[in-house]
Amino acid sequence: MPTPALTRYSMQNLSVDQYLRAHIRTVPDWPAPGVQFRDITPLLQDAKVFRVLIDAFIHRYMDPSIRPDVVAGLDARGFILGAVVAYELNVGFVPIRKKGKLPFTTVEETYELEYGSATVELHTDAVKPGDRVLLIDDLIATGGTMMAGMKLLEKLGAQVIEGAAIVDLPELGGSDKLRASGLALFTLLDFSGH
């Protein structure tokens, strides 16, 4: 059953999927020629659209069988989504940051990029062993960042119950790689092309 906001703001008889998709801007040839960049900022700029977006996640994670104890957000747009989702679910939020941004003792995980590597970190006291964690980001492309986030949480004994994102770019193979690793995924929209 849709939440009141989902019903109220599903305008012009559009489904939630269609409504959200209509508010994602595609920027051709950015950041490089041939890339179709999926810009989520229009989803955040309009309060009604942002509410529909957040309600789509909340509607899923209110289910007791998949309700998290903690939400972890990936640097940086995962912070925007994760903090609001955690607030709405009345659970804690923990940021997974790029290396060198957290002031306390951390664990780290390095992952490969198309041209190099990157490292993300998490405070060692961010989660407790056995915590059920929802790992959230804006988009899944190659899956490297989400995979690194999952490994960090597991190093601390947490159970990642699901990875979530607004957009999946299935042609880049990240969602397949994440599912093959055993991570359950929930994405609101799939976009072909990248």
Curated annotation (Swiss-Prot):
InterPro entries: Ade_phspho_trans, PRibTrfase_dom, PRTase-like, UPRTase/APRTase
Superkingdom to which the source organism belongs: Bacteria
EC number assigned by the record: 2.4.2.7
Chief localisation class: cytoplasm
One example GO MF annotation: adenine binding
Catalytic reactions of this protein: AMP + diphosphate = 5-phospho-alpha-D-ribose 1-diphosphate + adenine
Gene Ontology CC terms: cytoplasm
GO terms (BP aspect): adenine salvage; AMP salvage; purine ribonucleoside salvage
A Pfam family matched in the record: Pribosyltran
Gene3D superfamilies: 3.40.50.2020
Subcellular localization: Cytoplasm
Pathway where this protein functions: Purine metabolism; AMP biosynthesis via salvage pathway; AMP from adenine: step 1/1
Keyword terms, alphabetized: Cytoplasm, Glycosyltransferase, Purine salvage, Transferase
Subunit and interaction comment: Homodimer.
General function of this protein: Catalyzes a salvage reaction resulting in the formation of AMP, that is energically less costly than de novo synthesis.
Similarity comment: Belongs to the purine/pyrimidine phosphoribosyltransferase family.
NCBIfam families: apt, PRK02304.1-3, PRK02304.1-5
Protein name, per record: Adenine phosphoribosyltransferase
Organism expressing this protein natively: Albidiferax ferrireducens (strain ATCC BAA-621 / DSM 15236 / T118)
